Amino acid sequence: MAGQGKPQIQFKLVLVGDGGTGKTTFMKRHLTGEFEKEYVATLGVEVHTLVFHTNRGPIKFNVWDTAGQEKFGGLRDGYYIQAQCAIIMFDVTSRVTYKNVPSWHKDLVRVCENIPIVLCGNKVDIKDMKVKAKPILFHRKKNLQYYDISAKSNYNFEKPFFWLARKLIGDPNLEFVAMPALAPPEVVMDPALAAQYEHDLEVAQTTALPDEEDDL
């Protein structure tokens, strides 16, 4: 009974990016989050409650998903207000979704200012990548964390949440003590492909940033 009454640690996380980048698919991988989602009609968003079990106790991310309304223009400020962290997603098979990352970032920091942000390149299970590791520079210029992910194969699903949890709690020793229950993978991530991407990212991190003042 000692733990009763102890408030659960929770954070509002906003998930942004162009339509079709796989944001909703990504959220639906987490089974309890899909079961417990709520629809906020006034803002036209779905809020998925994702719980991760850590050595510091359970951490809950209330993930706000746009429910596709970004296709009709920018999101209203109410979507971003009081967000404590964010994930910006693009599709590695679509250059335009990466080119739009700076505008999503700009909207985020205009309302939320200094919150931890993870940039995710989704669909790395598809071999026909249009956005390779070397040109992905935006996160380095803006001091964001970056992960390759594949929502359909569950590849690196927990990584963005793990990094954000450590940042938000302020504990570099925080660990997940159990993996979340995820939907079975729809595709299998080729281990050799994953290893190649990880190697490419490591090499890209050591490459000097270009001098020009280009957003990307």
Swiss-Prot record:
Modified residues (N-acetylalanine): 2
Cellular location(s): Nucleus
Keywords: Acetylation, GTP-binding, Hydrolase, Isopeptide bond, Nucleotide-binding, Nucleus, Phosphoprotein, Protein transport, Transport, Ubl conjugation
N6-succinyllysine sites (modified residues): 159
Example GO BP: ribosomal subunit export from nucleus
Top-rank taxon, per record: Eukaryota
One cellular component term from this protein's GO annotations in UniProt: cytoplasm
Start and end residues of each stretch annotated as Switch-II: 68-84
Reaction equation(s) it catalyzes: GTP + H2O = GDP + phosphate + H(+)
Ranges where the Small GTPase Ran-type domain occurs: 7-171
Alphabetical list of PROSITE patterns matching this protein: RAN
Broad class of the protein's primary localization: nucleus
Modified positions (Phosphothreonine) in chain numbering: 24
UniProt-annotated binding residues for GTP: 17-24, 65-69, 122-125
InterPro entries: P-loop_NTPase, Ran_GTPase, Small_GTP-bd, Small_GTPase
Tissues of expression: Testis specific.
Covalent cross-link (Glycyl lysine isopeptide (Lys-Gly) (interchain with G-Cter in SUMO2)), residues: 71, 152
Documented EC number(s): 3.6.5.-
Span list, region Switch-I: 37-45
Cross-link (Glycyl lysine isopeptide (Lys-Gly) (interchain with G-Cter in ubiquitin)): 71
Pfam families cross-referenced by the UniProt entry: Ras (PF00071)
Recorded family membership: Belongs to the small GTPase superfamily. Ran family.
Function: GTP-binding protein involved in nucleocytoplasmic transport. Required for the import of protein into the nucleus and also for RNA export. Involved in chromatin condensation and control of cell cycle.
Protein name listed in UniProt: GTP-binding nuclear protein Ran, testis-specific isoform
Gene name as annotated: Rasl2-9
